[in-house]
Amino acid sequence: MGNQIKSVMLLTAMTAFLLIVGQLIGGRAGMTFALIMAVGMNFFSYWYSDKIVLKMYRAKEVNPGQALELYGIVQRLSSNAGLPMPKVYIIPQQAPNAFATGRNPDHAVVAVTEGLLNLMNREELAGVLAHELAHVKNRDILIGTIAATMAGAVMFLASMAKWGAIFGGFGGNDDDSPLGFAGMLIMAILAPIGAALIQMTISRTREYQADATGAQIAGNPKGLANALAKLGAYSGRIPMDAEPATAHMFIVNPLSGKSLATLFSTHPPLEERIARLTGARPQSGGAPSGPERTARNAEDSAKDFWDSLK
């Protein structure tokens, strides 16, 4: 119920924001355009935003005959979580990453990249998939897909502000825009930052919650902790062709290494996430090397984690 209220609040806030920006850019004509745009975006956000995101990344649905191990892990973890079996998609990119989308647990999708399947062992893959199913269980997925669509709308308005500054606003008359030429250029610069802030308002805490819930679904935190360590090591080496508006949907930031993306990161630090899973203190020199931990330390860390959940 809490996340349903958040979804309504997000839709309301974004509608108001689009109307204000439209009015500032193009006066009455701009506000009318923004109103039409907001109504359309609200409708499509609920019914089609998941399909748009999947199409954006050219993700392909797979069945047990095409990806038996992947499908089997998702099936087992879904049963552990008490969730309906989601659809399973593979993204044709070598950068290791994953996300979940959909409007509710009955219409959920889990998508992983080819790079993730190549990089992770079975336990680590289960940890990643459990994290994504945790987003489904916690009903984060609708908020995430709405935020992606709305952030894209803000980016579109930024582009309109830029061209409006060049050609004189929506109606071709400088008087239509309360901002004027300089103001519209400023809007074109600030709107992408606004898009990043929208993603951040989804709250980084949902990643911590998904990590904890995912560890419970998987049965232990070790697989996810090791997977996050690997993702941290490889995310900078293999760039992902990702849209900034969807960055918050992935298990790790797909825009790693880009200074502006880091400044407005939609994810908490990986070393902190790993530390919470393992019960260790985050290392100041970087993410703990999870795969290099001894078996005894891993068992002790897992015990600390489960004790903290009691």
Curated annotation (Swiss-Prot):
CDD domains reported for this sequence: M48B_HtpX_like
Record-annotated membrane-spanning stretches: 7-27, 29-49, 141-161, 178-198
GO biological process: proteolysis
Keyword annotations of the record: Cell inner membrane, Cell membrane, Hydrolase, Membrane, Metal-binding, Metalloprotease, Protease, Transmembrane, Transmembrane helix, Zinc
Signal peptide from the UniProt entry: none
Binding site for Zn(2+): H131, H135, E207
Domain of life: Bacteria
Cofactor note: Binds 1 zinc ion per subunit.
Membrane topology type: Multi-pass membrane protein
Residue ranges with Basic and acidic residues bias: 293-310
Cofactor field: Zn(2+)
GO molecular function, one term: zinc ion binding
Compartment annotation: Cell inner membrane
Region (Disordered): 277-310
Active-site positions on this chain: E132
GO CC annotation, single: plasma membrane
Enzyme Commission code(s) on record: 3.4.24.-
Homology family: Belongs to the peptidase M48B family.
Stored NCBIfam families: PRK03001.1
Protein name listed in UniProt: Protease HtpX homolog
